[in-house]
């Protein structure tokens, strides 16, 4: 916390280390993922339990494509998107299929979905 206090007292910006750094040619929009029911912890992990932030998931194309091909495995109710305590139900695939339909999630795997 000392660097934060020092920054506040001196009005000097903190020096940040980027943890999640996608290649420049990858387009990623947080808002569409949130709107479609992808929870923060799905990609970022249990950040509330990380003493220092680290990259939980590879964020490599194969990892992203798995979710795009099988969103029913990962979506959750919109009111649970920001919950760090959310646990998928035992019948996640059933619930996920319903949410995919309700949220009108398309299984977008075209290159141009992410590469622009």
Place the predicted regions along the sequence by residue.
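Short, solvent-exposed interaction modules
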Residues: 16-26, 30-31
């Amino acid at each position: 916390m000392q660097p934060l206090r020092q920054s506040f007292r001196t009005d000097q910006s903190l020096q940040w280390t980027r943890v999640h750094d996608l290649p420049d040619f990858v387009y990623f929009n947080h808002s569409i993922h949130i709107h479609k029911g992808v929870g923060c912890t799905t990609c970022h992990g249990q950040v509330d339990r990380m003493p220092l932030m680290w990259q939980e998931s590879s964020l490599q194309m194969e990892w992203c494509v798995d979710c795009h091909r099988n969103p029913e495995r990962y979506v959750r109710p919109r009111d649970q998107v920001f919950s760090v305590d959310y646990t998928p139900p035992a019948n996640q695939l059933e619930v996920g299929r319903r949410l995919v339909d309700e949220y009108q999630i398309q299984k977008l795997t075209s290159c141009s979905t992410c590469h622009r």
